[in-house]
Design a protein with these regions (language model features):
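Juxtamembrane loop-helix boundary motifs flanking transmembrane segments in multi-pass membrane proteins
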Residues: 1-9, 102, 141-146
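Aromatic- and glycine-rich beta-strand/loop motifs that create alpha-glucan
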Residues: 1-26
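Terminal transmembrane helical anchor/hairpin motif
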Residues: 2, 6, 35-65, 173, ...
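Membrane-interface helix-boundary motifs at transmembrane edges
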Residues: 17, 96, 100-104, 167-177
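N-terminal hydrophobic signal/anchor transmembrane helix of membrane proteins
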Residues: 25, 121-126, 224-230
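Residue-level recognition of transmembrane alpha-helices
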Residues: 27, 109, 183-184
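Secretory targeting signals
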Residues: 31-83, 107-176, 210, 214-217
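Helix-loop-helix units of permease transmembrane domains in multi-pass membrane transporters
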Residues: 83-115
Length: 240
């Protein structure tokens, strides 16, 4: 059993390392958007970009639609879902009839998923500090202090780890369909809602990145249409 666990962790760690291309694209695109944010004053929307939004606050104030934050979450979704997808097959994953193998498989996923979540959160801490330092001038009314930023990062870390671990644990004792439903309910009910529903939409898609990309694009489009139909004339893209 111990050798099996070590082997699974090594395999999942190797899969995690193979995400470097997506990580580079993700980090690079976020930094480019940050530079664009620095070039344009967006007032209160900057606070939404840094602290994130909940589903409820998005629906109530779609004019404060944080484009950079949504792209941030889509990037995280691509990385995390693809990490799971690479090893979710009927031959090697939770469809194994042998329960001990299935248990160790998901233990490895929980461990490596936590490492991935921590790495992304560290990057986002640095990224948010960059935005705050760029807007430290008195010309901008950014009502964010260090306590608010710390609380935001703690929720971000807990939210990322919990949504991943919840899916793994439910799938261990049930199956992926139940895990997907539980994760969706977890987000919609707003327990630590830092992520919209599309964060866990791709768990059902294990047939390739194209299918997941289509699913994500459709759900992001739905959120955009909600914002557009409610307050399209008040949406703030790059300027007040």
């Amino acid at each position: 059993m111990k050798n099996m666990m070590v082997g699974l962790i090594k395999r999942d760690s190797w899969l995690l390392l193979h995400q470097w291309r997506r990580l580079v694209v993700y980090f690079g695109s976020i930094l480019l958007i940050d530079i664009m944010l620095v070039m344009y004053e967006r007032g209160a929307v900057i606070e939404q970009e840094i602290l994130g939004v909940s589903v409820q606050s998005f629906l109530s104030e779609p004019d404060k639609f944080p484009i950079q934050w949504v792209w941030n979450q889509v990037g995280i979704l691509i990385i995390v879902i693809d990490f799971i997808r690479k090893d979710l097959s009927r031959n090697t994953s939770c469809f194994m009839p042998h329960i001990p193998k299935r248990k160790w498989y998901w233990y490895s996923k929980i461990l490596c998923g936590g490492v991935l979540a921590c790495g992304i959160v560290v990057f986002q801490i640095l990224e948010k500090q960059f935005i705050l330092s760029a807007y430290s001038s008195a010309d901008y009314c950014i009502n964010i202090n260090s306590t608010m930023l710390l609380e935001s990062e703690i929720l971000l870390l807990l939210g990322m780890c919990t949504i991943y671990w919840l899916y793994a644990i439910v799938s261990l004792f049930g199956n992926e369909i139940i895990g997907f439903i539980v994760c969706t309910a977890y987000v919609v009910l707003g327990l630590p809602v830092k992520f919209p529903v599309f964060y866990c939409a791709g768990f059902m898609y294990r047939r390739g990145t194209i299918g997941m990309a289509i699913a994500m694009a459709g759900i992001v489009l739905a959120f955009t249409l909600i914002a557009g139909t409610k307050k399209i004339n008040r949406m703030d893209i790059f300027s007040e």
